Structures are given as C-alpha cells and as structure tokens.
Amino acid sequence: MVVFPKSLSPKHVLKLLKSEKNPRAAFALFDSATRHPGYAHSAVVYHHILRRLSETRMVNHVSRIVELIRSQECKCDEDVALSVIKTYGKNSMPDQALDVFKRMREIFGCEPAIRSYNTLLNAFVEAKQWVKVESLFAYFETAGVAPNLQTYNVLIKMSCKKKEFEKARGFLDWMWKEGFKPDVFSYSTVINDLAKAGKLDDALELFDEMSERGVAPDVTCYNILIDGFLKEKDHKTAMELWDRLLEDSSVYPNVKTHNIMISGLSKCGRVDDCLKIWERMKQNEREKDLYTYSSLIHGLCDAGNVDKAESVFNELDERKASIDVVTYNTMLGGFCRCGKIKESLELWRIMEHKNSVNIVSYNILIKGLLENGKIDEATMIWRLMPAKGYAADKTTYGIFIHGLCVNGYVNKALGVMQEVESSGGHLDVYAYASIIDCLCKKKRLEEASNLVKEMSKHGVELNSHVCNALIGGLIRDSRLGEASFFLREMGKNGCRPTVVSYNILICGLCKAGKFGEASAFVKEMLENGWKPDLKTYSILLCGLCRDRKIDLALELWHQFLQSGLETDVMMHNILIHGLCSVGKLDDAMTVMANMEHRNCTANLVTYNTLMEGFFKVGDSNRATVIWGYMYKMGLQPDIISYNTIMKGLCMCRGVSYAMEFFDDARNHGIFPTVYTWNILVRAVVNR
C-alpha cells in the first residue's frame, strides 16, 4: 500500500500512476489519492487514468470518474472528453458516448469541436448505428462544424462495414475533386475491407491508384494485401508485393510483415522462400518474435525438413524465450512424422519438466508412436495420462484405437473400447470405424455387424466410413448380395452412400464378372445425384478388359472421354493392356499416341505392356521399336522391362539375343530376379 505525504500534489500522483504498470493497481492508487484530505485531481491526472481504463477495458469505472470530474468542477480540455467518448465507442456503448458528448460543457467545461464530432461519429459506426451516423453528419451543418478529412474517413469506414465498396470508392473520388486529399488511412480502410471480402484484385487496383496519386502506402497496407493473397494461395502476387515493399524506400517491413510472409508462404508450400526471408531477417538483424519462429518451424516440419526446423527451434531455445505449448507441439509433431522417436521422447521430457503439455501434445505423441510401431510406448503414455492429470478426449480415443488397429492389434483396440465405455467415456464414429474396418479385413463380419448395433445404442450415427468398411468386408467374403442390399439400405439408416461406397461395390461386382449388376449401380449412382468419377470408370474398364469384353470396354472409354473427366496414365494402361490381350495392337498404339493430346505421358508400364503384346503376336521387330521409343522418351527400363524383352526374344529369336539385354541390365545396375533366371533356363531347355 502506498503511503502518501500529507501535502499531496497532482504531479506526485501522476508520477506514481505512470510508474505502476498494472492497470488495476493504478486505478486503486487513483482511488486512494481521491480520498486523500485536501487533495483534488488535475485534468492531466484524469486524462491519464481514463486512457489506462480504455486500454484495459475497465470501462465500468469510467462513469464514476466522469461524475467525479463534474462534481469537482475540474476544467478539462477536449482531449479528456475525447478519451471518454473513445472508450465508450471502443466498447460498443454509443448511447453513453452520446450522453457525454451532449454534456461536455457541463462535465468538462469545454465545447465539442470537430474532433469530438468525429469521435462520436466513429462510435456510431463501430456500433453499426447507421441512422445515427447520418443524423449526426447532417447535424454538422446546423452546428456550424465543417467536416474535415477524418470525418470523411469515418464515412468511408461506414461504407466498407456495410460492404458498399462502390460508395467508398465514390467518397475517395469526391474527396480528390473537392480538395480533401485522402490520406493513407482513407485508402487502407477500403483496401482492408476489400481484402477481407475476398475482392483482392479490387484492393490491389486501389493500392496502385493510391501510389499513382502520390499517397505513400504504409506497411499496414502492404501487410493487408500480402496476407490476403497468401490466404488465397496466390504466392506469386504476394511475392511481387513483397519485392515492391523492399524497393519502397519510404517504408520498411515490420515483424508483422515477416510473420505474414513466413506463415503464409509455408502454408503455400514455399519453404525455400520462407528460409530466404528468414536469412534476410538475420542479416539485417530484424526483430523476430515467438510467432516468427513458430511459423517457420511449422512450415519446415510440414515440408519434411525437420533437421532445419530443429535448428530454428534450438535457436529459439537459446534465446531463453518463453516457448509456448503450440510451438512445442509443432516440433513434437515434426519429430513424430519423420520417425525421430528418440528425439520426440527427449522433447517430451522437456515439455513435461516445463509444464508445457496439453491434451493435443498427448494426441500428437501417441499418434506418432503408433505410426512408428511403438505400441508399448504409446500404451504407456496412454496409461499415464490420468496420473498426470489429463483426461483423454474423443480425439485421443480415436487416435489410440486407430493406431492399434492399423498395427494389427484389433483385440487390444476392442479392450480399450470396453475400458472407455465402462468408465463412462464415449467414442466417436471414427474410433468405431477403425475397429469395424479392421474386423472386416480380418473377416470377422459378425463382430463388425454387432459393433454397428452397439454404435446405435450409444447414440453414434453411422457414417460412410463405417458403411464402406462393411460393404468391403462383405465383398471380400463373397457375399455380394448382402453387400448390394446393405448399400441400398444405407439411406434408411441415415447414411447416404457416397461415390466411394458405389466404387467398392462396383469393383466387387466387376471382379465377379457381374457387369450387368455393376452397370445397374452406375445408373443408380446417377439417379441419386452422384457422378461416376475416374475410379468408377477405371474399375469398370478394368473388369471389362479382364473379361475380354473389349468392344464394351471401348464403348465405355468413349463414354468416359465425353464425360469431361480428366483421364490418367493408369486408365490408359488398363485399356492398352486389354487391347493387347486380344491382339488389337494397332488400336493399342493409337490409344498411346493420343495420350499426349490428353496431357498424359506414357510410363514404363505402358511400354512394357505394348512390348509384351507385340511379342505375343510374334512381332519382335515392333517390340524392339517400342524399346527404342522408351529410351527416346528418357525412361530407364526396369527389371520388368528387361524380363519382358528377354522372354520375347527367347520365344522369337533365341537365347543369344536375350543375353545381350541380360548383360545390358547388369551394366545398368539392374540385377536379375528368380523370374529372369526362369526365362533363360526355360529357353535353354526348350532350344
């Protein structure tokens, strides 16, 4: 408690208030001084404490101070009144702001001038009281107050808040015409709201106009635009603006600019550009805050450059900075994703020691351990959570159960599920989906079906992941009828089939040669508003080709090309293989020739398939021409390519020709497999 001298002056109180950094403590000190015998606050002291209350949103105390000023008849200038009106405006209290404005002479002993009018006008804008804004602006003329640049800036702000951007642009044009030269605030207000509304091209156009008219943009203008373009993943335009900023001698990037660039570019996958900016910051000794480090670490971890991320993290640690849990979690996730389990556990110990752990940290570590096959370690962390004061959430359950299932521990996952439910916990649909999918893959369909019923009892709604797992399980068990029935019943159970659901079933039907039923489900897809995707067509095409129904396959191919979907090399290869299997080599060559027109490049599978096809019809010359094409296109043959040509040459020309390619393979560092030796041995035996 501060002990005041008997004779207390406002100057002494002001000094004490300025030295007190805690706003609440400062206000308590102000209150104590108010009660001191023979003491009265000065206008300067009132102004100081009102500003402090504004900063900390201690707005409930403002009215008491205003009443104190009035009762003590302390004559104040307009600045004191403005601080009150601003505070009320900032806290969405326009009625209180208006009351103070009307009583300025009574309370503060001063008349409202243009600044007071503008501040009240802004309070109405912040509260979105548009009618009062217009009424007050109309009152300017009655009161004999001439609007100034700041007045029009407030009106521009109102237009932007109302999304009336054309009106805001109109204000700017009118201001130039009438001699009110817009300033950087006028332009940045419109640019900011255009960017927030996603109208980045309009914002950039206004930014260019601003520069052309001689209004120098400040760093805030650059930050707004760069941030907007990076959020839209337009890193090219963002980099152009960055370069303009560096070339602009009147303004310099600040820590916020660097943070926007590093965070935004890393989200665009431009980590190399982030590192260039980082190095530039270090060379120029630019200020870096925790967010700068955290953003770069996050970007590097996402890009897989965990070693560099660790280096940046260590640099941050060496600064003795207070590292937050978000940054720790980012680094922990980076270590886990790249398999650095030792480093993950070392960092975990540090995090626990510094009490920088939350439930997200546990989720990251458990997931990382499970993804790297460390089941025992993950289980230990899971078991220790309650003792450490952390309760697992649905995400934790989902991660742990999914990880156990992926690693083949479905029984352990079932045990965890029972533990959770018996302790009053609840699993989400994704945890159930993991177990059901694993049970289906292990052909434990009855257990999977029972678990679906359990989900319903616990109020967990089915989703497509669960249903798709069951459909897949039924198909693997050759229960196609049940799979078809289940898909059609999905909608009745509150889960609409997706394209993936149909693709799983169509694939199973095609493998069983049931093309009529598969086609019926394609028709049903269309009727239910789903369009077959690339995978749907690939499944159908593969099934038809495998069943040597090439005419139907070609009909489907032309239907696919007319659908507007983009094809890929795999689909071309399916058709080429099908054509080769029935000896239609010329048609297969035509399909390959047309690949280039569809922005598709033939790969090794394409060439290997064609070579095999030509050898099967005894055309070794064209098969070897294909080999030449392969080299011409810059492809390096693999062991399958060598096996194909050696087998073909053994059949058509003899072992001696095949041995030339055998030697060539070894010269290129490609070593024979068992299949290679079988080809050569059979050729020698059959010679």
Swiss-Prot record:
Keywords assigned: Repeat
Native source organism of the sequence: Arabidopsis thaliana
Protein's UniProt keywords contain Repeat: yes
One Pfam family in the UniProt entry: PPR_long
This protein's name: Pentatricopeptide repeat-containing protein At3g09060
Gene3D superfamilies hit by this protein: Tetratricopeptide repeat domain
PROSITE patterns on file: PPR
Entry keyword Cell inner membrane: no
Per-repeat ranges for PPR: 42-76, 77-107, 113-147, 148-182, 183-217, 218-253, 254-288, 289-323, 324-358, 359-392, 393-427, 428-462, 463-497, 498-532, 533-567, 568-602, 603-637, 638-672
TM region positions: none
